[in-house]
Curated annotation (Swiss-Prot):
Protein name (record): UPF0499 protein NCU07353
Secretion signal span: 1-16
GO cellular component, one term: extracellular region
Disulfide bonding pattern of the chain: C52-C66, C59-C71, C65-C80
Domain comment, as recorded: The presence of a 'disulfide through disulfide knot' structurally defines this protein as a knottin.
Annotated localization: Secreted
Organism of this sequence: Neurospora crassa (strain ATCC 24698 / 74-OR23-1A / CBS 708.71 / DSM 1257 / FGSC 987)
Keywords: Disulfide bond, Knottin, Secreted, Signal
Family indicated by similarity: Belongs to the UPF0499 family.
Length: 84
């Protein structure tokens, strides 16, 4: 009897960690799916700006390039080059 209680408790603990579950929202009104990797639902990560562009990459203005570089137009294409 004691062994079966321990076994059922252990299986409940393991299944709670492995199987996807639900938890109550902070208000307690509705269930929310539980996730290990939570991302903000209202942010669009696809269009995040790049910190800066490296040498010989295309640019639109000098502020696109990394520090110490400038955007120069050559042969109809603008690229980041080291500033003198």
């Amino acid at each position: 009897m004691k062994a079966s209680i321990v076994l059922v408790s252990f299986l409940g603990l393991v299944s709670g960690m492995v199987l996807p579950g639900h938890r109550l929202s902070p208000s307690g009104a509705k269930l929310q799916p539980r996730s290990l990797f939570k991302r903000e639902a209202n942010l669009d990560y696809r269009y995040a700006p790049e910190p800066c562009r490296a040498i010989l990459t295309t640019c639109r203005v000098t502020s696109d390039c990394c520090s110490g570089m400038k955007c120069v137009s050559a042969d109809g294409e603008s690229v980041c080059t080291p500033s003198d």
